[in-house]
């Protein structure tokens, strides 16, 4: 992993297997399949990057997937997320367009059965995910509950995009930023999908235990901060940096609005500290939940409960690994690529521009 992330503390059991066999062949297979379905353009570099990101994220987020059907669900929900994010992020003409949101809500309301004559790319992926996950979950009541919970989470995610994009117009407020970000990052529906893959007979009411809910709140915030570190370079190059958490910290701490090695170092260390506190809190909840339910459940139920907890935690570890291995955040022309690889020695080379706060 890049040394930029060496000070982030993750328990080992949160990290999924890093080696991905036949990775390039899997990417090629999925890109060809979705070109044939009309989701991708075979000549589009953007589509190739999104396909690569979706394959890798499905592998690292959903390492609990047991078969191609579950891997496909992971791919589709991630591709739907990426394409929806690209459609709305930093584009007020889209996130202020009520019709664009209503089309998505119509797809969800009708569970993928829509009468539109044409679809945006993000709508195609969402429809495919909804139809396939409904079929996947139909014979298990727990999975059906999660199927609907994920759709609710997708509504919350889409509704958060407008407020999140408006944050750049207001002074930095850490509490508000992280509150919106826990929805905007789409962690919760992704996590519920991972749990859907492992839950069978466990009483699903356990997922509404206060400690379980608080653990997920910490995990969602932690994931959003790690994602902001991963995406800093991409958002800088795209001109969409002003809502990045690291940017906000640097901006708040600089009266002269300069972007130098010192301010960057302070900002990164604060995020490391925030992430580590959140991870430690989540790990404490994990331990407390396991201790509590080991006394309440029989051996078979407890084994399933541990799988549910693990599926949640692997999302965060998978996000840490994924962001360091995909083209979406690691482009060759990135002004921060060397910074990621060799933090202390390279930061003075690149972090010497005032245009960041223009």
Curated annotation (Swiss-Prot):
This is Terpene synthase 12. It comes from the Eukaryota. Contains several highly conserved motifs that are important for catalytic activity including the aspartate-rich 'DDxx(x)D/E' motif and the 'NDxxSxxxD/E' motif, both of which are involved in complexing metal ions to coordinate the binding of the isoprenyl diphosphate substrate in the active site. It catalyses: (2E,6E)-farnesyl diphosphate = (1S,2S,4R)-beta-elemene + diphosphate; (2E,6E)-farnesyl diphosphate = (+)-valencene + diphosphate; (2E,6E)-farnesyl diphosphate = alpha-selinene + diphosphate; (2E,6E)-farnesyl diphosphate = (-)-7-epi-alpha-selinene + diphosphate. It holds the Pfam family Terpene_syn_C_2. GO terms for molecular function: metal ion binding; terpene synthase activity. The gene is TPS12. InterPro entries: Isoprenoid_synthase_dom_sf, Terpene_cyclase-like_2. The keyword Amino-acid biosynthesis does not apply. Signal peptide: none annotated. Belongs to the terpene synthase family. A motif (NDxxSxxxD/E motif) lies at residues 227-235. Terpene synthase that converts its substrate farnesyl diphosphate (FPP) into the sesquiterpenes beta-elemene, valencene; alpha-selinene, 7-epi-alpha-selinene and a yet unidentified sesquiterpene. Its EC number is 4.2.3.-, 4.2.3.198, 4.2.3.73, 4.2.3.86. Keywords: Lyase, Metal-binding. Gene3D superfamilies: Farnesyl Diphosphate Synthase. It comes from Dictyostelium purpureum. PANTHER family: BETA-PINACENE SYNTHASE-RELATED, TERPENE SYNTHASE.
């Amino acid at each position: 992993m890049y040394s930029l992330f060496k000070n982030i503390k993750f328990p080992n059991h949160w990290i999924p297997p890093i080696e991905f066999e036949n990775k390039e062949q899997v990417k090629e297979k999925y890109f060809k399949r979705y070109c044939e379905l009309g989701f991708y353009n075979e000549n589009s570099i953007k589509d190739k990057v999104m396909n690569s990101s979706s394959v890798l994220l499905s592998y690292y987020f959903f390492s609990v997937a047991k078969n191609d059907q579950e891997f496909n669900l992971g791919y589709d929900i991630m591709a739907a997320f990426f394409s929806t994010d690209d459609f709305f992020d930093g584009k007020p003409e889209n996130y202020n367009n009520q019709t664009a949101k209503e089309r998505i809500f119509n797809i969800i309301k009708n569970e993928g059965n829509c009468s539109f004559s044409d679809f945006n790319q993000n709508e195609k992926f969402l429809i495919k995910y909804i139809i396939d996950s409904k079929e996947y979950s139909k014979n298990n009541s727990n999975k059906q509950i999660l199927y609907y919970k994920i759709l609710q989470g997708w509504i919350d995610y889409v509704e958060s995009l407008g407020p999140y994009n408006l944050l750049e117009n207001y002074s930095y407020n850490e509490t508000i930023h992280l509150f919106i970000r826990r929805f905007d990052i789409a962690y919760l529906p992704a996590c519920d999908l991972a749990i859907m893959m492992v839950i069978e007979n466990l009483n699903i009411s356990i997922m509404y235990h206060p400690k379980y809910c608080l653990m997920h709140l910490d995990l969602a915030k932690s994931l959003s901060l790690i994602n902001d570190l991963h995406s800093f370079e991409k958002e800088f190059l795209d001109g969409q940096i002003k809502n990045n958490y690291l940017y906000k910290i640097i901006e708040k701490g600089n009266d002269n609005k300069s972007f130098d090695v010192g301010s960057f170092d302070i900002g990164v260390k604060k995020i490391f500290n925030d992430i580590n506190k959140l991870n430690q809190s989540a790990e404490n909840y994990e331990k407390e939940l396991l201790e509590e339910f080991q006394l309440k459940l029989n051996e078979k139920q407890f084994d399933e409960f541990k799988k549910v907890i693990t599926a949640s935690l692997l999302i965060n570890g998978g996000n840490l690994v994924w962001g360091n291995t995909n083209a979406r955040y690691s482009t060759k022309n990135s002004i921060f690529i060397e910074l990621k690889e060799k933090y202390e020695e390279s930061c003075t080379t690149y972090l010497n521009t005032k245009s960041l706060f223009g």
